Amino acid sequence: MKTQDIAQRWLDFFAAKGHTVVPSASLISADPSILFNIAGMVPFVPYLSGREKAPYDRATSVQKCIRTADIDEVGKTVRHGTFFQMCGNFSFGDYFKEGAITFAWELLTSSIADGGYGLDPSRLWATVYVDGTEKDEEARAIWRDKIGIPEERIQGTGKADNFWSTGQPGPGGPCSEIYYDLGAKYGQEGGPIVDETRYIEIWNLVFMQYQLSAVRSKTDFDIAGDLPNRNIDTGLGLERLAMILQGVENLYETDQVRPVLDAAAELAGKDYTSTVDPADPHHADDVRLRVVADHIRSALMLIADGVAPSNEGRGYVLRRLIRRAVRAMRLMGVEKPCLPALLPVSREAMKGFYPAVEEDFERISRIAYAEEKSFLRTIASGTARLDEAVTESKAKNQPLSGAEAFALHDTYGFPIDLTLEMAAEAGLAVDETGFRALMLEQRQRAQADSREKKSGHADLSAFNELLAQGQTVFTGYSELDGESAIRGLLSGGQPIAKASQGQEIELVLAETPFYAEAGGQAADTGLISGDGFVIEVLDVQRPVKDLSVHKAIVREGEVAIGASVRAAVDRERRHAAEQAHTGTHIVHAALHQILGPEALQRGSFNKAGYLRFDFAWGEGLSTATRSEIEEVANIAIRNNYSVQTTEMPIDEAKALGAMALFGENYGSRVRVVEIDGAWSRELCGGTHVDTTSRIGSLTLLGEQSVGYGNRRVEAFVGMDAFRHLAAERALVSELTEIMKVPSTQLADRIGATLAKLRATEKELDRLRKAQLTAAAGELTTKAQQVGKTRLLTHDVGQIGGADELRSLALDLRERLGSEAAVVALTGESNDRPMVLVATNEAARAAGVKAGALVKLAAGVLGGGGGGKDDVAQGGGSNVGQIPAALAAINQAVAAL
């Protein structure tokens, strides 16, 4: 039975039992605290935990999962894999232990004809929770009395294996696991408590029945009492069941994985033997083939779900998977790109249950192939240096130094895991501690540079002293002006007691309505005034956490520490910034609505009237897609959605599905901004309008790449959007006047005009080349004997480009024959001079080198250049020096 048929049979069985079939969620977890969905139950956590009411009483799914904690073990054993599929059935306050156990037994043991998997009941074992005096006798009784499993095939295990919790206070409960006996050749008799190689776990049934009040570890927790609603969460490993039903030795030989393994073996010219014995001569290659088979499938599925290679987070996991697969192939002798041969094989194996991998394969393959090419360049540049370093370290009988590992990372792009892997293969350890210390030092330098940019100074001691007096209280969420007092004055980062008119200062208030630049939102500006003085605030930064520093200039009077002030934010500018920030959230939600949840935020910036938003996406957006996004955004604005902000514990925010920027550090309490409830829900500390209609309108300006796998959209909002559209309308009107057509025909007329222009330019190029060719014969007569060679120097004037100049020079060199000859030509293109020199073999034998002559002439022209001894070219900036440049070449040749 094919894996996809096993999965479909699972869904059909539970659908017939009244379960709602829930499609697999993306591999990308909605929980910002984890990279990927690592288990089938993760998408159901809000329901299982009781934080949200489930929209169904029973559900079933086949969930895509990624786990990379044991990535280094992949291939070395036949049980570890990074991508897997978890079949699950869930009950939310409906059936409990007896229902879950009965369903599991029926599906596993019913015949194929009756819709089951047809497993031999005598080969199935069960475990139940037993830990000292705590025993799940209810589950044991169901297995024994209801199902009929002999007592000797029901074994008890403790908290470590048979009790589930979230790792924090909340729901928990005992588990019951189902094991399959693979047979005597796989190990000892005695059940799973004796040998989990022979007895393989296929299904785990979790009975959520307790409320845990404290969880200190997996085996140390307190049970507060029973849950009001008891839930069921089960998970069956699809690949493990496929292995059993397909009669193969391990997951690498199942129908979704083996084709890639075979294709890799054929490409490398290797025979796969399935060995896991390190002493076996085939072991190293078998491990590599298993790595390739696993990682190629994982990469395919990750890219399909919107992950793109990068140096952090999910993108780094994908990058590592691709690079490990490519390197495994190289270690088997395959140095050319291998993904074009292997990725389509994985697509064919997976498309039956996941049609998106075929529908989107053009994008998937483009991303994967580009990453492979990039990695091959990295290997080519860094491997030689690593080999040298390994040899030197071995000669000194020392590990590879942290400094060397850091240099490989910083200069050649070698990630530390690749250095560790390659060094280990050479039998050498790496000073990871030293490497980490240098990486930390680099980060600290970068952070110091960032702080210096924010404060204008490297020395932050004065700011830290002010912070010790108390944090800045921000009042700007609820008011735009208010009373305060000056707590600190600085100039050039140094404390001062007072400042007078015209002086640039940094000012710290006890409390302020001014928003300091943070979270992608630009700082407020405005005025701070007091008795006899006015200060203009130009910027607000936080050089140290919790301290707002106002960069300002004294416009009137004299100001001193301790003065009472009135701080007033520029209201119009703040409102425009709020329009942009709420607009950013709307664009984010619109991207998710049109592209899907994989369009993850990578960064954003918003200021008065303008926003930009960076997101993960592997290709450019079509004009139609951009229009859809813009329409969704403006519908949200027109609908006048309410914008609400709430502070809450971060766990509660996660449970609500609030989006966050992965990698950001959030405190235990966070601020959640909601637009129309769940339409948009994000963690955000910025300022916002109170209803979306206050934005007015939003106009996308365009979209572009900002690094591999990441895109950027920009937009105007409010009056800036209106002004932009008005300017566009005026431009269209002007163009219709120029082109003498209505606006509906403008694109066609401009296209036709450009086509004619290109045709004319092409004809001019042809005529110019023909003219040069015709003139070549006459030009050869201008060659003069200079020293030991015949030298032809000539300025051709306006020319199409360097290629034309080169073509003419080579033609002239050929016409001058085999005696020593040098051709030196100059020309002008786009108001800049060019020079090209060509020498024949006899001239080079006489000591004339084209590269040296071009370097000399280009220097005269105010530029540079060079090349080989036979042909070289250069350029400059001073067209008027062309005669002098040719004269310099003449003198240099004469001197040889």
UniProtKB/Swiss-Prot annotation:
Q: Which InterPro entries match?
A: aa-tRNA-synth_II/BPL/LPL, Ala-tRNA-lgiase_IIc, Ala-tRNA-ligase_IIc_anticod-bd, Ala-tRNA-synth_IIc_core, Ala-tRNA-synth_IIc_N, Ala-tRNA_ligase, Ala_tRNA_ligase_euk/bac, DHHA1_dom
List the disulfide bonds in this chain: none
Listed SMART domains: tRNA_SAD
Alphabetical list of PROSITE patterns matching this protein: AA_TRNA_LIGASE_II_ALA
> What cofactor is this protein dependent on?
Zn(2+)
Pfam families of this UniProt entry? DHHA1, tRNA-synt_2c, tRNA_SAD
Q: What is this enzyme's EC?
A: 6.1.1.7
Q: Where does Zn(2+) bind?
A: H581, H585, C684, H688
Designated name of the protein:
Alanine--tRNA ligase
Instruction: Identify the coding gene.
Output: alaS
